[in-house]
Amino acid sequence: MSGIRVRFAPSPTGDLHIGGVRTALFNWLFAKNKGGKFILRIEDTDETRSTGESAKVILDAMKWLELEWNEGPGNENLKYSPYSQMKRKERGIYRKYADELVAKELAYPCYCTPEEIDVMRKKAKADKLPPKYDGKCRHLTPGQRKQKEIEGKKAVVRFKMFGSGTTVLNDIIRGRVKFDNSLLDDFVIMKASGVPAYNFACVVDDYLMEITHVLRGDDHISNAPRQMHIYNALGWEMPEFAHMSMILGAGGARLSKRHGHTSVLEYRKEGYLREALINYLALLGWSTEDSQQIFTIEELKQKFSVERCGISPSIFDPAKLLWLNGEKIRSKTPQQVYELFIDWLKYTGNEKLTETWDVELLKKALILEHDKIKLLKDIPSLVDFFFTKNVDYKEEAVKKTLLSEKSKDIAKLVLIESAARLPNQLDFSAISLEQYARNLAAEKNIKTGQVFHPIRVAISGRMQGPGLFQMMEVMGKEDVVRRINVAINKFFQK
């Protein structure tokens, strides 16, 4: 063995989902923490569902998350390659070891049809026995097998299981886990098509790729005894196993789209940061002694340990992920947020949304709205009013602030006075503008809010937004005065 070697082995039958990313992340962090190697292997033996497009989506998601692999597609080590199971199948890797097991009489060809096996299992259920294959082909003589082949019957290869006893897994996370061998049937290791079955292929690959630790979800724990028997039959040393807790949705239901996006790249489209998603997923099934919640990637590499993983299911909470994303955005400088936003626009194909926006004005607007951004997709709706020539006046804001019986006369007065005075305001800084507004309120014997609110609605069209005077400073004198005059003409010139 050559040090710690772990692998992430997704099946390209769809998008990379949250559970899969958590598995990849924990393997990656474990490798980083131990100075080991992280291997990416594509398990594409599902002949009907595996697609090249799904494989590309998986690679794209891994690249976005920057879970870089030491070995795998595009970065192959000739000692262990190829990293696609179908390519390995073409080289006869699995057939070689299946034939070895048959030669040792630890496996055998089975000619039973799916319909025959279905009948066996139904009968076992009716007899209140475990619904498993009954071993019909286990004791066929060489002559009987030859006759089956003459008849053109296709055979799978089944592994011979023990009918009694217990298999014990020493799991890093779960401790000793016992399996009753009597519940395990003679399982298929090679399909009739010559494609290896999952349990067989991953054992052969893990051994040949010198995988030292298998970290995976606990939905795979039922596969462990079968895989352990294959290791023993071939005389191979087993890796260490660690089965991580499942991720569930709210209320303990199986995670689905109603709990949030299942595809990782959907989170990218929504404007989540990779650091936020990684930070959040690290908390699903793992924790530190001090219950720290916010981590940098480097901190996760330093602090992660499999021993701190729990066995209770983790609940996926979209609200916490959203909160964490906002925290990560607030930890960035405005320049970094700008760069992330531009990258997001390119990824989502929305470059035209901002192609007429002044870059320096956008950067200044982002400074003002920095603390309100939870998702990158929030940015356009937060800052778009800075760039419009025609203010989009929100109906509620206009009714309440400009046109209500209680406010309209004062609002008209404030806007007309401001349109006349602001062009002569030499210092258009936020501090001076606030002083101007307070002086106007005192002069007219009205409340400061009666000055602030009409100006805000006149120049932005809305009641909420960044600090009024900081916003005015960023817009600049000419645009502020223009907007105020537009509002006067629109709402008060009859």
Swiss-Prot record:
Organism equals: Endomicrobium trichonymphae
Q: Which cofactor does it need?
A: Zn(2+)
Q: What is its EC number?
A: 6.1.1.17
User: Which PANTHER family does the record match to this protein?
Assistant: GLUTAMATE--TRNA LIGASE (PTHR43311), GLUTAMATE--TRNA LIGASE, MITOCHONDRIAL-RELATED (PTHR43311:SF2)
Summarize where Zn(2+) binds, as residue positions: 110, 112, 137, 139
User: Which EC class is the enzyme in?
Assistant: ligase
Q: What InterPro entries does the annotation carry? A: aa-tRNA-synth_I_cd-bd (IPR045462), aa-tRNA-synth_I_codon-bd_sub2 (IPR020751), aa-tRNA-synth_I_CS (IPR001412), aa_tRNA-synth_I_cd-bd_sf (IPR008925), Glu-tRNA-ligase_bac/mito (IPR004527), Glu/Gln-tRNA-synth (IPR000924), Glu/Gln-tRNA-synth_Ib_cat-dom (IPR020058), GluQ/Sye (IPR049940)
Short sequence motif named 'KMSKS' region, residue ranges: 254-258
Query: What reactions does this protein catalyze?
Result: tRNA(Glu) + L-glutamate + ATP = L-glutamyl-tRNA(Glu) + AMP + diphosphate
Answer whether the UniProt record assigns the keyword Transferase to this protein.
no
Homology family: Belongs to the class-I aminoacyl-tRNA synthetase family. Glutamate--tRNA ligase type 1 subfamily.
- Cofactor binding remark: Binds 1 zinc ion per subunit.
Which Gene3D superfamilies does its entry note?
1.10.10.350, HUPs (3.40.50.620)
Q: Which PROSITE patterns match?
A: AA_TRNA_LIGASE_I (PS00178)
Assembly and binders? Monomer.
Q: Which gene encodes it?
A: gltX
Q: Name the Gene Ontology biological process terms.
A: glutamyl-tRNA aminoacylation
* Keyword list, A-Z: Aminoacyl-tRNA synthetase, ATP-binding, Cytoplasm, Ligase, Metal-binding, Nucleotide-binding, Protein biosynthesis, Zinc
Q: Where is this motif: 'HIGH' region?
A: 10-20
**What domain of life does the native source organism fall in?**
Bacteria
Q: What does this protein do?
A: Catalyzes the attachment of glutamate to tRNA(Glu) in a two-step reaction: glutamate is first activated by ATP to form Glu-AMP and then transferred to the acceptor end of tRNA(Glu).
Annotated positions binding ATP: 257
Name of protein: Glutamate--tRNA ligase
Compartments where found: Cytoplasm
